[in-house]
Amino acid sequence: MGNRRLAREHALQTLYYADTGKTQGKDINEYKEDFKDSLDAAGFEFCSGIIDGALEHQAELDKIISAYAKNWSLNRMSVVDRSILRMAAYEMLFSPENTPVAAVIDEAIELAKKFSTENSSRFINGLLDQIKKERKNGQN
């Protein structure tokens, strides 16, 4: 498994815990430290950047996701799907990494296939594709 994919998996787990409030008294930075040994320095920095960025921009990301999630409120989405969407939207719109958008979407789909329901990958793909099109048109 690639270092960035593993970093995204760890970021997803941390964002999941943050969203559900099941941090068991742990600070988000403590969760990040739990993953330090399984990633190289670049992977750990990438993982931390996604976590910090998605949390910092969460209100903006939620507005953007909500705008494209026709007939789906954020609260109606599974926590896993919501976390994947926040991560991917953050990477697409705010991350300084400049990861190609197609790669971000592909990784989000793979995370959904691994950690969510059968239909989640299609839902996530469709929503992120809409964000990509708007971004390309300069509207985000």
Swiss-Prot record:
Protein name (database record): Transcription antitermination protein NusB
Keyword RNA-binding: yes
Organism: Elusimicrobium minutum (strain Pei191)
One cellular component term from this protein's GO annotations in UniProt: cytosol
Record GO biological process: DNA-templated transcription termination; transcription antitermination
SUPFAM superfamilies: NusB-like
Gene responsible for this protein: nusB
Pfam families: NusB (PF01029)
InterPro entries, per the entry: NusB-like_sf, NusB_fam, NusB_RsmB_TIM44
Family membership noted in the UniProt record: Belongs to the NusB family.
Record's function text: Involved in transcription antitermination. Required for transcription of ribosomal RNA (rRNA) genes. Binds specifically to the boxA antiterminator sequence of the ribosomal RNA (rrn) operons.
Keyword terms of this UniProt record: RNA-binding, Transcription, Transcription antitermination, Transcription regulation
One MF term in the entry's GO annotations: RNA binding
